[in-house]
Amino acid sequence: MQVSVRDNNVEQALRALKKKLQREGVFREMKLKQHFEKPSVKKAREKAEAVRRARKLARKKAQREGAL
């Protein structure tokens, strides 16, 4: 990953880098990889995340249809 530093503004470059890493999911992946996660626990977590995403999508869809 590459971020350009303009006008010696390192703080702005760090913010841009952090935003890119956040979008890529690097911080989340690092947090998950700190400790070993049993395959059964990983499977349950991923299933719960999928259910959460589906509910969120259904909520948004229902809200959009209600507004129309």
Curated annotation (Swiss-Prot):
Q: Quick one: a GO biological-process term for this protein?
A: translation
Q: From which domain of life does this come? A: Bacteria
Determine if Ribonucleoprotein is one of this entry's keywords.
Answer: yes
Q: Name one GO molecular function term.
A: structural constituent of ribosome
Keywords, ordered alphabetically: Ribonucleoprotein, Ribosomal protein
Q: Name one Pfam family in it.
A: Ribosomal_S21
GO cellular component, alphabetical, reads: ribonucleoprotein complex; ribosome
Similarity comment = Belongs to the bacterial ribosomal protein bS21 family.
Recorded protein name is Small ribosomal subunit protein bS21
Q: Which organism was this protein described from?
A: Paracoccus denitrificans (strain Pd 1222)
The opening ranks of the lineage are: Bacteria, Pseudomonadati, Pseudomonadota, Alphaproteobacteria, Rhodobacterales
